[in-house]
Amino acid sequence: MAELPRERMDQVLKRFELIETQMAAGPSPDAYVKLASEYSELQEVANSIRALRKAEAELEDLDTMLADKSIDREIRELAEIDREEVESRVEDMQQKLQVLLLPKDEADEKNAILEIRAGTGGDEAALFAGDLFRMYERYASERGWRVEVVSASEGEAGGYKEIIASVTGRGVFSRLKFESGVHRVQRVPATEAQGRIHTSAATVAVLPEAEDIDVDIKPEDIRIDTMRASGAGGQHVNTTDSAVRITHLPTGIMVVSAEKSQHQNRARAMQILRARLFDMERSRAANERSEARRLQVGTGDRSERIRTYNFPQGRVTDHRINLTLYKLDRVMEGELDEVIDALIADHQSKLLAAEGAES
């Protein structure tokens, strides 16, 4: 295990103790809100540092006792048992702190824009895109998040050719960001008379929702066009007679929104445009960092096949971490935590390896 950054631990603890003092001094309401937010961010790591230091002091006391040759044999045996237990506890605490002290992704606490597009497979791909959207809807509901459809183009046989939604709630992006990529399904379509298994795919993109302060969009860099809305006529389309299309001229990114009012159209389209530009900048910065240290960690390449859903076998396989679960029905019902937790653990282990390589 890599050496803990003791100097950084000191800085975190000093900052946390300063915040505790400032909050107790009765600051203004605005200042208190900011302090409380930072307090919440640092509380777990600060408490872990304090607990580790207490356990390390206990271990040092036991070592001092065991170094005394004159102590009674029975007391020595008890002290040795205590030392093993405390040493194990210290190692566990150190591993936990290694993870807590990893560099934070500034986007982790942001809301997200979820985009799902049917890929190869025609009607079956659109149906699968619909299944994926419902899976994420159920997962969001379990976590108390809110899902709001921004735009949708329905498939001719059901499902979606494309659906875009905003997902809001605590820690949304931190949980969903590893879902970006190509999702593949293997199953027998309802229209397949011979019972043959078909393979189709859908692409998922999860973008952190950007604020105005995250992305500076100059008025002269965008073109706004109003046009008639079009779609398959489902519940999420044709809610207004016209739609707004915003084109970001420097990048060529185009966003279309068909909300119930022109004001909502423009606001929604700008929300998605900001998210896409923010994601583009994050990807560029991540690629530069990866190139610099020659190690890629969780790039979320959307051309990468990340997961296969095999219905005949009731199997879900995440190819990035070689995880296979035989609980497809439950996963499709939104029970994604086991998969997402494994992906986060894998990501953290890669970050730890990168930190060790750089230290």
Curated annotation (Swiss-Prot):
One of its GO terms (molecular function) is translation release factor activity, codon specific. It comes from the Bacteria. The modification N5-methylglutamine is found at residue 235. It is found in: Cytoplasm. Its main location: cytoplasm. It holds the Pfam family PCRF. Methylated by PrmC. Methylation increases the termination efficiency of RF1. HAMAP family: Rel_fac_1. NCBIfam families: prfA, PRK00591.1. Peptide chain release factor 1 directs the termination of translation in response to the peptide chain termination codons UAG and UAA. This is Peptide chain release factor 1. It comes from Chelativorans sp. (strain BNC1). The lineage of its organism: Bacteria, Pseudomonadati, Pseudomonadota, Alphaproteobacteria, Hyphomicrobiales. The gene is prfA.
